Every structure is written in structure tokens, then in C-alpha cells.
């Protein structure tokens, strides 16, 4: 087969795949992403860059998984806060019954407007999520966590009873039903998940996530969250350095890693990630332990430089503008920044009765990466 014929055959195959399986099912790693994907920022500039489209795509399923106390819930709550800042409505399905309102509020979540459910069974939790998403009035739903969505038969049974594959079947059935509704209503669905170890695995990674394979298949984005090291102030531990790896991404090339500081009681340190990204792009100069900007020293050591940025918002904003430009991340739209009430009115139309198709909420869209 000639070179031109091979190229034509490949293009025909790619078009057929996209027609059969949807946009983003296959792509060249170096090509530009779809600029029409509507997104909401994750609350972390580094994660927005790693995701490749400037945030979480609307109408898609996202899975966040990792070991215990790695920062999974923190990452999800930052997404909730960002949606609420843009006039959106958020729902939180707390299957673990471990929601901390004070911590969520510290991260920027409007607790008074957050819709919270603490279901008794997995079926109840997923049915509540389905009803909320189907209403067209919800912009983001967080399920915390998949492992805690216990099937009714297991709840009502005796300790020690065998329920092989019951939760996997529940998740498979629920996701088949939810995926289409999520896409139509442009809702972001975030499923937090734990990790387990497969017994008898001698080679390869023994870790897996509970709930079967369905969530892995239906997720547009899968994020693996792991602690890298502790952050100390003198001898006191004040936070954790966390790595967020994009292990699956159907809207941009995957396998990128974002490193963030999660500070106890504060969430993701935006000044810390801004400093790291600016230093990587030579926007902020780093010589030894000193950080400087436009020839002026802003701190000796990373923590002092972070503190300087927190105390000088004008400098921080100027650096952030340059970092966004360097990484190709859009700032929020002028409409959202200047007229938030208008955005709220547009979002309210989604919930208006008689609408055949909910209006897509106004949100920043990603330009060329």
C-alpha cells in the first residue's frame, strides 16, 4: 500500500472511530484539543494545566482515587467551590457520612447553598444523584465515595454473608443510566474512590479500585491522588505535598502530573503552585534559595516566597496572568467577572419548567493548548 493510500486509510479509520465512539475516543498526542469543550476550573492552576483543557469538562464523569488521607475530598471540594463562584448549583452525596462543613467552608464552599445527601444504601444514593442530574438544575455532583455505596442486600443481610459482584453490578447499571443524562444536562459528575489490593498478584501493580470496571470505562478523566512528602514548619507538620496524576483523559493527552501543596485547614495552596509554575517558566527567577521577580527579591526559601505572594495580591495577580498565558489556561470570562448576576440568571433558566433542553451554563472555554 502506497504512503498516500495508507494516510487516506488511516484518516478514514479515525473518522469511523469518532463516528462510532464519539469525539475524543482517539487522537494524536501532539494535536490540539477540541476548543469547543466547556470547562470549569478545578481550583488548582497546576491541575488545570495537567488536564489540558483548563479544568473539568462539563457533561463528563470524573473519578478521583487514591490512598487514605491523600487529598481526594479536598480536590473535589475545590471543584464545588469553583462551580458555586460562577453561580452554579452543587450537590454532595456523602455516602461515607464524613462531610466536614467547617473544612468545606474554609475551602470556599457555600455551605448554605450546597445540596447534601447522606444516603442509607448505595441504591438510594445513586437514585438521588440521578434525580438531581435529570432535573437539569445541578452543575456538579460529587459522590463520596464509591466504596461506601453499599448495596441494600448487603445492608439488610448478616455479617459474613457473601455478596460477590453485587456492588460492581450496581455501579454498572447506574452508570449506564447516568452517563447519557450527565452529557445532556452538562453536569460534572465526580466520583471519589478508594483503593484495594488484589490478592495473589506477584507481578505488576496489585492496586485496584472497588466498584468494578464500569467506572473506569465511563470516566472521561481519572485522577490518581497520592501524598509525596510532608510540609513542615520547624518540627510541626502543616500540610502535604501531593501529586495528582491524570491517568486517563479523553479530552486531552493524559499522563500529566500536577504537584500541589495541601495545607491543613486551608486546602490547596494557590500561592505555592503559582510560585512553582512561575519558576518553571522563568517568570520568577530562582537562584539558590532566593526567589526574585523583576529583579526584586521576594523571599528566601519557598515558604517565605509563598508568604510574600499572599501578602502582595497585586504581584500575585500579575504573575498569575503571565503563568496562565504561558500554559494556555484561560482566566474566567469577562461576563462572569463583571456581571455574576447575569450568569446566575442564565443558569437559573436550566431549572425552568417546560424547557426541552437545559441551557448550557455560561463558563470559560479552553482555547488552544
From Swiss-Prot:
What is an example of a GO molecular function annotated in this UniProt entry?
ATP binding
Q: What is this protein called?
A: Protein RecA
Where is the protein localized?
Answer: Cytoplasm
Its primary localisation, in coarse terms, equals: cytoplasm
Report residues binding ATP: 66-73
**Gene encoding it?**
recA
Q: Which UniProt keywords apply?
A: ATP-binding, Cytoplasm, DNA damage, DNA recombination, DNA repair, DNA-binding, Nucleotide-binding, SOS response
Q: What does this protein do?
A: Can catalyze the hydrolysis of ATP in the presence of single-stranded DNA, the ATP-dependent uptake of single-stranded DNA by duplex DNA, and the ATP-dependent hybridization of homologous single-stranded DNAs. It interacts with LexA causing its activation and leading to its autocatalytic cleavage.
Q: Which stretches are tagged as biased composition: Basic and acidic residues?
A: 339-369
Region Disordered, annotated ranges: 328-369
Concerning PANTHER family, the annotation shows: MITOCHONDRIAL DNA REPAIR PROTEIN RECA HOMOLOG-RELATED, RECA
HAMAP family from the UniProt entry:
RecA
Gene Ontology cellular component annotations, sorted alphabetically: cytosol
